[in-house]
Structures are given as C-alpha cells and as structure tokens.
C-alpha cells in the first residue's frame, strides 16, 4: 500500500481532490486535512443579495462594472460530511448568496455508486426546495482510476465510474459533468506508471468517444478540465484540438483558473478557448512562497491572480455561466466564515456592490 500521508507531505498534491479511500487507505477528507494551514477567518461581511444595485464608482471597493456571471461554490469548501450534512451545506450556500453549488461524486457519500436515480432525484428536489441550483458535478475519482491508465482494470473502473457520473448528473438536474480525460503522470501517486504522451492522447480520445453517446442521450455535457499537473493538454491549442475533434456540442471545457497559474495565465487561455468554456472553477493561487502543494490555493482574493483581467476575459467571450469557487480547506473553526467571505469576494469581483 502506498504511504499517502507521506506522499501528501512531500509530493505535489492534486489541486482538485485526493485519491480514492478504498484503494489507497486514506479518506479524501483526511488527506486534505494534512494540507490545512488556515485557521478561522472572520467573514468579510453579510452576503450581498444576488440582485444588487448598479455597481459603485470606487474601484478600491469592487469592480465598477456589473458582470452577468453567476456565483457558485464547490462542496469541498464545506466541512462535509464530518460536521455538516448535505442539506445544511446547500442551505448555507443559499443563505450566503450563492446561486449554485457544485457537488462531488465520491465512493462514500450521498453522491456515490451506492446512490441511484431515486436518491439523486431526492437531492435535486431538496436543492429546488432550498432554492439553489446544482451547477455541476465533479469528482476526484479520475485520479485513482484514470481513463488512460496503463492498468486495464483501472481504466475499466474509471470508465464505469464516468458512466455512473453521467447518469448521476442527469438525475441531479445538471447538464455539467467535469471530466479529466487522462494523465501522462501523477506526481502525487508513486504507484502510477507514467503513460507515454501519444498513448495517453489515443486512450483519452477513445474514452471520451465511448462516453459521448450516453452523454448526448441524457443531455449531459462532458466538460474537459485543464489540469496542467497531469502533463496532458498543456496549452490552449491542445485543448481546442481535443475538444473540437469530437464535433459535438456535448464535449466542452471546464476551465480552471488556478491549475495553470504556476507557469501560465488564465486570462490568456480564456480568450483562446472562447465559447468552448461551459463551466468554470475559480481557484485562487499564490506564487509567493508556494510549496507547490494544496497550500498554493488560497481563499478568493488572497493570491496573485489578476482577477479584473480574468473576469474581463470571460465577458469578452460572452461567458455568463457559473463561476464556482473551489477550495479544499474548510475552516476548522466557524466554517461558515469562509462561505460568506467567498460570496462577498465574488460580489466585489462581479460589480454587485453599490
């Protein structure tokens, strides 16, 4: 068995989740706790209503232009399931002023292979009753079960899980499924046998091609995420070539601002990807004193991302969908503070403060 505790301490850790608890002996939440360095931070203020007055004129307070994009947050920012249940997380997101929440498919949670259409439909109805949209479905399971693995059993399990996620997304009432199409390497997995670039590309294209018919039938978009740390689809043009090769409206891009910040710039990618961007992860990143681990990702606005340029780039492409904050360190004390703080930050970024 791989010593994942030591691996998380010394290796580059994935900025989108951790390994499968059953196959590697450590839960997602436990692994993420190893990277937690943030103590409770007080909220920046009460959430601003989703529909606000015209933006103010002081650029020190907030954007002076109103943007159409919608506010969303990923479930990983909540202390779920340790200290809050799913209903409480949805309600907190709604109360904080978010219009949507992105859920995560796991092996041991309310959203797992153990749940079927009945259970997922109940979650959708619960979200509807609370008044919050499910902006998308995400999963860390593409790492223990990569679609391009040299191990046929891992590939087969990955395809099986991706198919289940597609059905789950449909049942949850969202048409957005984040997909990691493959990996040349995974620095955080010492047991991963690197896949040659050409073979990785061939397998990734074959995998998405096999998943596509079901996705089209269920009207679920397979949104390909830019990872960078996996050594695959490293430039905007590579992503464009990959997505366009399927000639399907159901293969789009899930763009992550933070994953490329170490060496590149999200505002450059956005303008090139254009209308292909279907969904977005806002991950704040800092280049100051980073150890290239999960600690590189910070609370929103506490990093080195040029957010005015990024938001302007999204507007230039016509994007008006969800901006989902993704963060892996629920505050150990008063976790609601992070949620309200993030909502306030997004209000300022989107010009929702008068």
Pin down the residues of each PLM region.
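N-terminal secretory signal peptides
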Residues: 1-26
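N-terminal twin-arginine translocation
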Residues: 25-30, 41-59
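Active-site acidic/histidine proton-transfer and metal-coordination neighborhood
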Residues: 34-46, 60-66, 85-90, 124-133, ...
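Acidic/histidine-rich catalytic cores of soluble enzymes
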Residues: 68-70, 100-101, 137, 205-304, ...
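Conserved, mostly hydrophobic/aromatic
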Residues: 73, 93, 101, 127, ...
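Active-site beta-loop-alpha junctions enriched in small/polar residues
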Residues: 76-78, 104-106, 139-142, 182, ...
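Catalytic domains of carbohydrate-active enzymes, especially glycoside hydrolases
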Residues: 88-106
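Glycine-rich, proline-tolerant flexible connector loops at the mouths of alpha/beta enzymes
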Residues: 104-124, 181-184
């Amino acid at each position: 068995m791989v010593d994942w505790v030591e691996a998380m301490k010394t290796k580059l850790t994935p900025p989108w989740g951790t390994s499968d608890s059953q196959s590697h002996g450590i839960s997602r939440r436990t692994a993420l706790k190893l990277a937690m360095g943030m103590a409770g931070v007080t909220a920046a203020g009460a959430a601003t209503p989703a529909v606000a007055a015209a933006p103010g004129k002081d650029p020190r307070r907030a954007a002076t232009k109103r943007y159409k994009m919608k506010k969303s947050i990923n479930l990983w920012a909540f202390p779920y399931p340790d200290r809050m249940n799913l209903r409480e997380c949805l309600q907190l997101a709604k109360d904080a002023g978010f219009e949507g929440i992105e859920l995560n498919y796991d092996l041991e949670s309310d959203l797992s292979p153990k749940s079927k259409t009945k259970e997922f439909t109940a979650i959708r109805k619960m979200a509807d009753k609370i008044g919050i949209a499910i902006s998308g479905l995400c999963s860390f399971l593409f790492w223990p079960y990569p679609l391009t693995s040299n191990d046929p059993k891992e590939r087969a399990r990955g395809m099986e899980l991706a198919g289940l996620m597609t059905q789950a997304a449909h049942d949850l009432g969202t048409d957005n499924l984040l997909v990691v199409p493959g990996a040349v390497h995974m620095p955080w997995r010492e047991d991963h046998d690197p896949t040659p670039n050409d073979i990785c590309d061939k397998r990734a294209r074959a995998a998405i091609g096999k998943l596509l018919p079901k996705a089209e039938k269920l009207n679920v978009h397979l949104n390909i995420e830019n990872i960078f740390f996996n050594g695959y689809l490293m430039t905007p043009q590579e992503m464009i070539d990959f997505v366009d090769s399927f000639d399907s409206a159901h293969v789009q891009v899930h763009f992550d601002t933070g994953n490329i910040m170490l060496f590149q710039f999200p505002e450059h990618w956005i303008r090139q990807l254009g209308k292909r961007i279907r969904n977005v992860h806002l991950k704040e990143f800092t280049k100051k004193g980073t150890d290239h681990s999960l600690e590189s990702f910070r609370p929103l606005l506490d990093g080195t991302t040029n957010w005015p340029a990024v938001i302007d780039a999204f507007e230039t492409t016509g994007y008006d969908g969800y901006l989902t904050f993704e963060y892996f360190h629920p505050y150990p004390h008063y976790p609601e503070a992070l949620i309200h703080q993030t909502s306030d930050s997004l209000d300022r970024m989107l010009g929702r403060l008068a």
